[in-house]
Design a protein with these regions (language model features):
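Conserved beta-strand scaffold positions in the cores of enzyme catalytic domains, especially
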Residues: 33, 80-83, 130
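Active-site phosphate-binding strand-loop segment of PLP-dependent enzymes
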Residues: 86-131
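Conserved N-terminal alpha-helix of the aminotransferase class I/II PLP-enzyme fold
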Residues: 1-46, 50, 63, 70-71
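PLP-dependent aminotransferase-like
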Residues: 41-103
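Short active-site oxyanion
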Residues: 31-33, 54-57, 127-128
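Short glycine/serine/threonine-biased micro-segments
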Residues: 37, 60, 111
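Short, well-ordered coil/turn elements that cap or connect secondary structure elements
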Residues: 28-30, 77-78, 97, 124-126
């Protein structure tokens, strides 16, 4: 397939994956699947724009998760996020917070070697997302 995301075979494969996910999730017309690869700063901008409605809470315990938290913190259209951090080798925990519509955490931080078992936040506002 080549190594560049600009190669026709790669673009074709990504298109098939997006179409398949759209079909799997029965997405309405006009909805799109966004894919990003590791280190894709543009993906964090897309996620900040399209997944967080107003306020987010983050578990930040490595490079991957901290980038999303920083991106949301810099987004002028969003409220100030709550960011929970921890000592190296450990992971913080979410706390239910009124007005938070998105809770975001990595499952596995390769930069620190910490992995968690994601779970919905007890007593979170109705409709809050867990990413």
């Amino acid at each position: 397939m080549g190594t560049s995301h600009r190669q026709k075979p790669v673009k074709s494969l990504v298109g098939r994956v997006r179409a398949g996910l759209s079909e799997l999730f029965s997405l309405p017309d006009g909805y799109e699947v966004v894919l990003g690869n590791g280190g894709a700063t543009a993906f964090w901008d897309i996620a900040a724009f399209g997944l967080v409605n107003d306020r987010a809470q983050f578990l930040s315990f490595g490079e991957f998760g901290s980038k999303f938290a920083k991106g949301v913190g810099a987004a002028p259209h969003l409220g100030i996020p709550t960011i929970h951090t921890s000592d190296p080798g450990d992971a913080p925990a979410f706390t239910a917070e009124q007005g938070v519509d998105t809770y975001a955490t990595p499952q596995n931080e390769t930069s620190t070697g910490v992995a968690i078992t994601p779970a919905r936040v007890a007593n979170a506002d109705d409709g809050a997302l867990l990413l």
